[in-house]
Amino acid sequence: MSQIKFLFVMDAEVGAPLENGEGIIVLDHEGAHYVVDALISNELYRSHVFAPEINWYLKQTQAEHNEKNEILKKLYEMRFIRYNYAPKKTHAVTVDRTVLMIGESEEALALVESAKRYFDVTHVLPQELLSIEGKFGSFTAHFNQKSEEEGEMKEQESEVCCSQLVVCDQLSELSKHRGVECVMDYSDTDALLKRIRNRIGHYEYKKTITYDATHCMYHHHEKTACSLCTDICPTFGLVSDETRKELIFSALDCIACGKCVSVCPTGAIDFAPFPQKAFLEVADFCQGKKILLIAEAYLKTLEGCELPSGYIPYVIETDPFLSLLHLKALFEKSTHTVLFYAPHIGEATHEALKTLNEESLRTCHQKAIELVQSKEAFEAYMTLTCKNDAVCKKEIENRQRIQHG
């Protein structure tokens, strides 16, 4: 059987606004069980890409049948564009059970003993450590090891190779590497051990950032003030070589937060899972619609909230990558105020919102983006919007009635 491009699995809760023959294969759960290969689906039945926004939209929307049908098709196409542009190549590192633990407190010693149940542990005191090099899966630590020879304590330099590291007693810059954890970042040591355990084996990752040096204000510029991306990066996924004036990217250490994308003033850095070109193509499907901009992780938070007719969810992987360009594009496509649900936003996104709203209020006499940061705020905004729409509709009807005498 050839691959099914779009699969919709219906159940009693979401129904089936579509019928077969409209570009989407519609099956019940029993039928979907026999599907060999589907590219995009509203369920996890043997699909390459799961689109949770589809079921979410059908459960929350107040739209009539025809509008549901229209939006549903758009959601599949929007996901397809994201899939087409996203990186396909997978990289991998082998992670064995070797762990280096650095610490000297009683808590550190207790953690070392606990970790020995699961890992091949080497314990080093902070004052013994000389240097650490390498990367996740293949770190090498150099340290002084004391030993007694002929009644005298002597030090000799030793080294140990390990896949992961744990810093027990203090916060450390080392934790910017993937595979290095600080105990102080965890309230529960069991959670820490579980995280380390889950990485053992074949660890896969993909490229998360793309870069065009020709547009970079740092690359080979002797006199440059731009260091926005390296300043905001929370890991060693992006660092600068001050001697060569070049940026160095590590897909292995990158956590795909997208913060570097949001602050880049020239667009030299782009978010590989959802690049600007794809973002703009997806925005075309929102022409004239009211947009709910929301990260995929927050869909569950808004379950049970009504989504009025006319709204289309614009779902993104994460929101810190959003820049002024992204937000402005959505507003221009929609022409309505874009509703942006995000419990937390970074400083760069906040500044982009402020700049865009000031401009739109000055030129269009309306806000471009309305930020809501809680479920209660979302519901309050929707209630107010629906009331205002009803008032406007009534005023228009009254004017038409007067005009036609």
Predicted regions and their residues:
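Ferredoxin-type iron-sulfur electron-transfer modules and their immediate structural context
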Residues: 1-232, 236, 288-305, 365-405
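Iron-sulfur cluster-binding cysteine motifs and their immediate structural context
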Residues: 224-248, 259-276
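Long hydrophobic segments that form regular secondary structure
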Residues: 230, 237-238, 242, 308, ...
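A contiguous, basic/glycine-rich beta-loop/short-helix subdomain that forms a polymer-engagement track
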Residues: 271, 275-287
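Long, compositionally biased charged/polar accessory segments in the mid-to-C-terminal portions
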Residues: 309-322, 333-344, 348-350
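Short acidic, glycine/proline-enriched helix-loop-strand junctions
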Residues: 346-375
